[in-house]
């Protein structure tokens, strides 16, 4: 608080408490929606950073929050598909363990579609250029394509390979989206 502002300090405190108490202590062990709800804590850093720099909350950091928020489920559920037994043995109720592989694949695909649309919104609000829009469309299309391939895949062996591929691509995807937003606004 002494080095930023009260708004940033408050948001950071809420984020930490939410992550530690709501997500880690309470939800992680109780519900397969732990990733969706806990994803909010992981998505708050752009808003906190923005408030440190500006002292206010505007639409720009909210869009960044939404990108991370809608990225989180497909990223972690892909991981939980190819590490299902580990989660099961640890008694962590990830979606593949509680609802099955088919439901998880449907959810991964749905979240990838939502993410695709959300990632394009900075362009529609005038926060990024056509270069960002085209690049985000291409890498987002590939992400949706991978998630669709997983959705229709019947082979357990190939499902695990695709899930692992989605997990690692999702990391690259998020890095590229945020790097492109940054470079597009220099």
Predicted features along the sequence, with ranges:
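Intramembrane alpha-helical segments
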Residues: 1-53
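Helix-coil boundary and interhelical linker segments in multi-pass alpha-helical membrane proteins
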Residues: 1-10, 45-68, 120-132, 181-186
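Hydrophobic alpha-helical transmembrane segments
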Residues: 9-13, 36, 61-65, 105, ...
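Hydrophobic residues within alpha-helical transmembrane segments
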Residues: 14, 18, 40, 66, ...
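Transmembrane alpha-helical segments that form the membrane-embedded catalytic/substrate-channel core
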Residues: 17-24, 66-83, 116, 139-150
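Small-residue-rich segments of transmembrane alpha-helices in multi-pass membrane proteins
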Residues: 36-53, 102, 164-178
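Solvent-exposed interhelical
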Residues: 70-120, 126
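Interfacial loop-to-transmembrane junctions
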Residues: 145-176
């Amino acid at each position: 608080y002494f080095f930023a502002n009260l708004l940033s300090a408050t948001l950071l405190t809420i984020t930490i408490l939410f992550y530690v108490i709501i997500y880690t202590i309470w939800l992680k062990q109780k519900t397969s929606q732990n990733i969706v709800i806990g994803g909010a804590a992981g998505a708050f850093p752009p808003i906190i950073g923005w408030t440190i720099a500006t002292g206010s909350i505007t639409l720009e950091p909210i869009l960044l929050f939404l990108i991370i928020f809608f990225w989180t489920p497909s990223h972690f559920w892909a991981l939980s598909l190819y590490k299902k037994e580990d989660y099961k043995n640890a008694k962590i109720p990830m979606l593949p363990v509680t609802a099955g592989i088919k439901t998880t694949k449907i959810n991964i695909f749905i979240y990838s579609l939502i993410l695709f649309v959300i990632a394009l919104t900075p362009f529609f609000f005038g926060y990024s250029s056509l270069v960002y829009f085209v690049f985000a469309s291409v890498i987002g299309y590939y992400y949706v394509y991978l998630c669709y391939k997983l959705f229709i895949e019947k082979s357990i062996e190939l499902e695990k390979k695709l899930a692992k591929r989605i997990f690692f691509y999702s990391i690259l995807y998020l890095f590229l989206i945020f790097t492109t937003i940054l470079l597009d606004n220099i």
